[in-house]
């Protein structure tokens, strides 16, 4: 086989390119965390991007959908964080169809044609679509469906974070296979069957009916994506080890290393070229055709960037320099393409990879801080765990960036920028540099916390998880006196003894279920017949009655408060007070909810009541308290999928430009509680950049030590 070489590097996306697809030799699709998807068009040898911003949040996957109509160029499908799939006809500038139905992020897609499209989601289901209509909902996985494949007109394959592969005929499950030792990340069709890859670092080949054939080993970390190269009968794979690998049978023919941390997606063009998307925001094309190979100076620059790529010492383990070989080891050939060795060069440690094609070792990076964990480094008379060299401009000496593993990276970044009189707008970039060079994955380790793991492992801190907070304070005599005053104005008043019974019960704080049922009827009668401005005391009474409700009564209280939230707009003054009181009541109901149906209703209430900047302080506090109590319930019930959904609501609330300190503190308590689950913490970090947001809030309220402590505790969870 002629080896693949770089053809083009296409820049334009501002964040990770999570998905790529082949449309034709001249058209490529891409999806990015920057919230856009793009169609790249080759015109006169140059690639021109057409970016589209039709999603809310990041875009996670993209695939080409051939059209049945021969007059159409087909569609590009994109799916992402907003739970929506979009079909856009190639060559047009607006969506043709919106695909609604998934209850969480859409993370995978595959299509035979516009009548047979399959999507996978964090909601643990796959859906099959004909244009904009859902034909089937494939249920059975216990976690995110990260891989889908339309194998035939009604034959579908799904792979999940639950480690299973399932084969479907229509919506009927045909076979379930415990396929891998970790999350299944991608599927691709091969002659006579399909291939799968996983976080376990292994690629497996299967017949179309799910019989195992053989497996491929070579990747040193998670394998994210697969594609079949039809005109050469090869498989290409990519992953967290920065490589694309080319396979023929059981043999790895070539290993291409990229100057980036992760290669997320790979796809093959009809002419055999490969396109990939990576964590540095680039789309790259590799080719075996000498006509399409990049100019020599471009290739040289690419190889130089690969060789200078900084590899965290944690990525390769705690290296002892004295035990490493010197350059003499490079005189011995590698055993297989892609083999990696660590070499001691003076005071440095360099990584080299064996190239079968060129029959030589090629430098693929320099290990940063490749020393034992106990060593400290001096900078301006102080000891630090790390002192990095940071290049800020060509021709200038690198600047020193000191950092201790125990400190907040944002503090280190701010100190570095202020010391060197650099703009604070670079803070996020410096933090990413620190995190990349101090938080690596081991080349020998295949484990990554997946976003939908059912593990109940939690991290404990001195604050989290917090306890649920109830709204239990009330001036019962004043509340009931107000009820009597209003009741006396009614043409059809309540019996006086009903309000007397309510006052006695609330004052005693020991109420039987029978009494609560009777008092419920009194309060519900008020809600049904009194105006919004008059219902406040009744809602307040219901809030108190909801505390310590039995399993029989809790759903009733939940339904009552939910009805108020859904039926009353929160824009007017009286309206917003009604909703605020209902949110307080819901907060008191949460400790007595034990099922997923109740959780779903609580989530609906939160979603529909996210406060505006102009919302009253009490409204914001009630909302944040409900979110905090719900976060604790989700952890108790191990509902991690819903926990990840709650993150979206929390970060929307935390974006308030006119925050209230108590409300924000309770929202931070909710966030910290959720992030005691590593999978949710990973989602908070990767999707919402939680560290930056938490740091900004702590700075805003830096005069309050509780925010400083909360920041420290939350950041320790990532």
Curated annotation (Swiss-Prot):
PANTHER family: PHOSPHOLIPASE A-2-ACTIVATING PROTEIN (PTHR19849:SF0). The gene is lub1. Residues 353-448 form the PFU domain. Interacts with cdc48. Residues 462-717 form the PUL domain. InterPro entries: ARM-like (IPR011989), ARM-type_fold (IPR016024), PFU (IPR015155), PFU_sf (IPR038122), PUL_dom (IPR013535), WD40/YVTN_repeat-like_dom_sf (IPR015943), WD40_repeat_dom_sf (IPR036322), WD40_rpt (IPR001680). Pfam families: PFU (PF09070), PUL (PF08324), WD40 (PF00400). Acts as a negative regulator of vacuole-dependent ubiquitin degradation. One of its GO terms (biological process) is ubiquitin recycling. It is found in: Nucleus; Cytoplasm. It comes from Schizosaccharomyces pombe (strain 972 / ATCC 24843) (Fission yeast). WD repeats lie at residues 12-50, 54-98, 101-139, 140-178, 180-217, 218-257, 259-296. This is Ubiquitin homeostasis protein lub1. Keywords: Cytoplasm, Nucleus, Repeat, Ubl conjugation pathway, WD repeat. Gene3D superfamilies: Leucine-rich Repeat Variant (1.25.10.10), PFU (PLAA family ubiquitin binding), C-terminal domain (3.10.20.870), YVTN repeat-like/Quinoprotein amine dehydrogenase (2.130.10.10). It comes from the Eukaryota. GO terms for molecular function: ubiquitin binding. One of its GO terms (cellular component) is nucleus.
């Amino acid at each position: 086989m002629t080896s693949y070489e770089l053809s083009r590097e296409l820049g334009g996306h501002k964040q990770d390119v999570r998905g790529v697809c082949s449309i034709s030799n001249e058209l490529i699709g891409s999806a990015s965390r920057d919230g856009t998807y793009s169609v790249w068009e080759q015109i006169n040898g140059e690639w021109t991007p057409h970016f589209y911003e039709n999603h809310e949040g990041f875009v996670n996957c993209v695939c080409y959908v051939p059209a049945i109509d021969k007059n159409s160029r087909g569609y590009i499908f994109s799916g992402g964080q907003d739970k929506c799939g979009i079909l856009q006809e190639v060559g047009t500038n607006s969506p043709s169809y919106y695909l609604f139905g998934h209850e969480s992020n859409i993370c995978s897609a595959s299509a035979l044609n516009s009548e047979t499209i399959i999507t996978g989601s964090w909601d643990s289901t796959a859906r099959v679509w004909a244009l904009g209509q859902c034909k089937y909902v494939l249920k059975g996985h216990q976690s995110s469906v990260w891989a889908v494949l339309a194998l035939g007109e009604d034959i579908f394959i799904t792979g999940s974070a639950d480690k299973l592969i399932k084969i479907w005929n229509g919506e009927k499950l045909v076979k379930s296979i415990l396929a891998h030792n970790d999350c299944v990340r991608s599927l691709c069709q091969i002659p006579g069957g399909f291939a799968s890859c996983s976080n376990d670092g292994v690629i497996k080949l299967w017949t179309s009916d799910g019989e195992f054939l053989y497996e491929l080993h070579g990747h040193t970390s998670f394998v994210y994506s697969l594609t079949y190269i039809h005109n050469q009968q090869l498989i290409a794979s990519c992953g967290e080890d920065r490589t694309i690998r080319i396979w023929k049978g059981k043999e790895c023919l070539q290993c291409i290393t990229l100057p980036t941390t992760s290669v997320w997606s790979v796809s093959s063009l009809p002419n055999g070229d490969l396109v990939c998307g990576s964590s540095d925001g680039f789309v790259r094309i590799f080719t075996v055709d000498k006509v399409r190979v990049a100019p020599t100076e471009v290739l040289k620059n690419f190889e130089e960037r690969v060789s200078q790529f900084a590899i965290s010492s944690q990525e390769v383990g705690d290296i002892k320099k004295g035990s490493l070989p010197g350059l003499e080891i490079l005189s011995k050939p590698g055993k297989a393409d892609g083999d990696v060795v660590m070499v001691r060069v003076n005071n440095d440690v360099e990584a080299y990879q064996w190239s079968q094609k060129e029959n030589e070792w090629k430098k693929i990076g320099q290990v940063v801080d490749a020393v034992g964990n106990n060593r400290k480094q001096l900078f301006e008379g102080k000891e630090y765990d790390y002192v990095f060299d940071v290049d800020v401009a060509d021709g200038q000496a690198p600047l020193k960036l000191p950092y201790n593993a125990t400190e907040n990276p944002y503090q280190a970044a701010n100190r570095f920028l202020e010391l060197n009189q650099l703009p604070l707008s670079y803070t996020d970039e410096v933090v990413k540099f620190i995190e990349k060079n101090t938080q690596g994955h081991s080349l020998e380790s295949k484990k990554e916390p997946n976003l939908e793991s059912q593990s109940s492992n939690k991290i404990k801190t001195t604050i989290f998880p917090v306890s649920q907070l109830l709204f239990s304070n009330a001036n019962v005599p004043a509340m009931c006196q107000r009820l009597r005053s209003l009741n006396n104005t009614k043409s059809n008043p309540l019996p006086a003894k009903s309000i007397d019974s309510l006052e006695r019960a609330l004052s005693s704080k020991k109420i039987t279920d029978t009494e609560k049922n009777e008092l419920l009827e009194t309060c519900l009668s008020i809600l049904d017949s009194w105006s919004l401005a008059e219902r406040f005391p009744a809602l307040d009474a219901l809030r108190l009655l909801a505390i310590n409700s039995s399993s029989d009564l809790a759903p009733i209280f939940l339904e009552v408060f939910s009805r108020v939230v859904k039926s009353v707009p929160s824009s007017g003054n009286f309206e917003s007070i009604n909703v605020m009181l209902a949110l307080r009541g819901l907060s008191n109901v949460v400790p007595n909810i034990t099922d997923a149906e109740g959780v779903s209703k609580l989530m609906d209430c939160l979603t529909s009541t996210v406060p505006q900047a102009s919302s009253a302080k009490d409204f914001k506090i009630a909302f944040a308290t409900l979110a905090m109590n719900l976060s604790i319930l989700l952890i108790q019930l191990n509902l991690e999928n819903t926990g990840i959904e709650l993150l979206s609501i929390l970060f929307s609330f935390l974006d308030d430009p006119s925050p209230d300190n108590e409300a924000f503190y309770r929202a931070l308590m909710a966030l910290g509680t959720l992030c005691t689950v590593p999978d949710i913490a990973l989602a908070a970090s990767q999707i919402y950049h939680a560290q930056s947001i938490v740091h900004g809030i702590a700075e805003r309220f830096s005069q309050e030590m509780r925010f400083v402590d909360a920041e420290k505790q939350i950041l320790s969870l990532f």
